[in-house]
Amino acid sequence: FKSDYKYKKAEFKDDDSKYAKLIKSIEANGIGVNKIIETPKAIGLELTQFTHPNLDIVEEIIRSASYEAGVSKTVKKNLRVANLQGVSEYNKEFENNSLLIYERKSKRSFNTKTNFTFRPYLASREDFFKGALLLENNSELIIKDNFFFSTNLKYSIADNFEDLTLPPVNTYPAQVRSDVKDYLRSFGDGIFIGRAQFDYHITPKKNHHLMVSAGILEEMFSGVGFEYLYFKQDSNYAFGFEIFDVTKRDYEMRFGTLDYKNVTGSANFYYRNYDIIPFDAKVSYGEY
């Protein structure tokens, strides 16, 4: 697997230690350093990251950062994603026999980004193509390393969804998303909420991961639920299941709800291909 990622060099001060340089170099490339420990033969790095989709990129960054910082010892990593245990190259014994060099203090942080997006709607009964130009804000409050609150707010600058007036063909009863046109017609009624949810991540046992979510989960549903994932280190597949208790939101897409509730569940299989044509795949079966 060849990456197009370009390593970013960090700026150092004259009096920076090799560990300060190592931290700056790694964090300049989108990876957080939680802890550095050292033994006579090796250095242990506890890292957290959400940016890079491939472990090869992370390893490339660590190699380049170690060289740039002048670190000559073997580097062992403990990689976490939202505090879920991903890759671990050292154990408790290594940690107990090491010297603590650095530990980041946990603190809250807030990230926000606003941009323009285009929302198409194809092959409706009224017309083949409808669409909207949206101004979207995505924000995330990191309360703890494994506890987040994220929001998505939308405002329609221009759309032609008001033309979507023909009702769905009522072939089957309880077509859950058959009233999507009622949601789309409300895009022009001011700011609406695409998502506002809490997420909590935990790895209770090696290779076993849980995520609990609650709040406004998407444009049409709010609720609470969890996802279980089994992922073994160095494998290219994962599997699990998810269960959610959801309530349908009203068409204004703010805080109101409709008189429809359901419990959904699905089994999931994930596969990552590293061969000539790299790709990620997800196969899911269940009630949505």
Name every feature range the model reports, one short phrase each:
Residues 1, 44, 112-124, 149-151, ...:
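Transmembrane beta-strand segments that form the barrel wall of outer-membrane beta-barrel proteins
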Residues 1-202, 255-265:
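Outer-membrane beta-barrel initiation region
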Residues 21, 132, 232, 242-254, ...:
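Exposed, low-structure sequence patches enriched in small/polar residues
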Residues 22, 29-30, 208-211, 222:
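Phosphate-interacting basic helix/loop segments used at nucleotide- and nucleic-acid interfaces
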Residues 53, 236-238:
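Short amphipathic alpha-helical segments with coiled-coil-like heptad repeat character
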Residues 120-126, 157-163, 218-222, 234, ...:
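Gram-negative outer-membrane beta-barrel proteins
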Residues 131, 139-147, 202-206, 216-220, ...:
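Outer-membrane beta-barrel strand-turn architecture
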Residues 224-228:
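A short acidic, amphipathic alpha-helical/loop segment
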